[in-house]
Design a protein with these regions (language model features):
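Internal intein/HINT superfamily modules and their associated LAGLIDADG
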Residues: 1-258
Length: 258
């Protein structure tokens, strides 16, 4: 989908400068990893144990430094980023709302590093994002209202209820976004992909899509530490790592499958 001439993404303002950007690797020519290359340098790094500190906001996608990885069919490295990838956020706790002929995407996350990654991922798709702290040391990341997101909203919304489209499937880039927003390791050999607490109508279809991607998981209800799908076993975790690609620079150690 062409992003030129659609919506107001070019006029959107970058996130407030209250969030230190991680140091970036020296850019190298070649295939983009998770989006367009960063320009310039950034200062400091995010606090992984608390809310963002004063600093400059990251506006470009992080580089993973894993250019030697072999591409996996349907993996995050196998295609350029598109707006359709944002369905991965809606598979998790992301929300989309419509206003007139436009739509806005938002997601609440539980750690500062996730803000870095999501702002960069949205920027790589031509969507400027803002963020703000919320209750419980969480952060809300959201786009502006834009016509670019109207097809995504039309596919996922039935009235105001979020529901996956009939042909929904999970690619590496969709999984990468879901994991960046709401993926949590569960040692020694598990990984949780968290769901929207009010999205019960989505859970079964999301589980089917995970199974089709080779990531059949166990649905955990709210009383079991969820809602989330638990992915277990070395083979499935290796498959997850292949599909989502290497960790973004802002990711804390052990927070990403490898």
């Amino acid at each position: 989908m062409s992003l030129s001439g659609l919506g107001d993404t070019g006029k959107a303002q970058p996130p407030p400068a209250l969030f230190p950007a991680p140091e970036s690797d020296t850019p190298t020519p070649g295939r983009r990893r998770g989006g367009a290359p960063q320009n310039g340098s950034s200062q400091g790094g995010p606090s992984h144990d608390g809310p963002p500190q004063n600093g400059s906001a990251q506006t470009g996608p992080p580089r993973t430094g894993d250019e030697g990885r072999q591409l996996v069919f349907f993996g995050a490295d196998a295609a350029e980023p598109t707006v359709a990838d944002l369905a991965g956020l809606l598979a998790g706790p992301g929300e989309v709302v419509r206003m007139g002929g436009t739509a806005r995407l938002s997601v609440q996350v539980d750690a500062a590093w996730r803000v870095h990654v999501l702002v960069a991922e949205l920027a790589s798709r031509g969507l400027a994002a803002s963020w703000e702290p919320t209750e419980g040391e969480r952060h809300a990341v959201r786009t502006s209202y834009t016509r670019v997101l109207k097809p995504l909203a039309a596919a996922w919304l039935h009235g105001t209820t979020k529901r996956p489209p009939a042909a929904f499937h999970l690619t590496g880039r969709r999984l990468r976004l879901w994991l960046a927003a709401a993926g949590t390791p569960e040692p020694p050999d598990g990984f949780l992909l968290r769901l929207g607490p009010d999205d019960q109508e989505c859970w079964e279809s999301i589980g089917v899509a995970l199974g089709a991607a080779g990531l059949a998981g166990t649905l955990l209800g709210p009383g079991e530490g969820g809602p989330a799908y638990r992915i277990t076993g070395r083979r499935r975790l290796a498959r997850l790592a292949e599909l989502v690609g290497g960790p973004p620079i802002a990711t804390p150690p052990h927070a990403w499958p490898t």
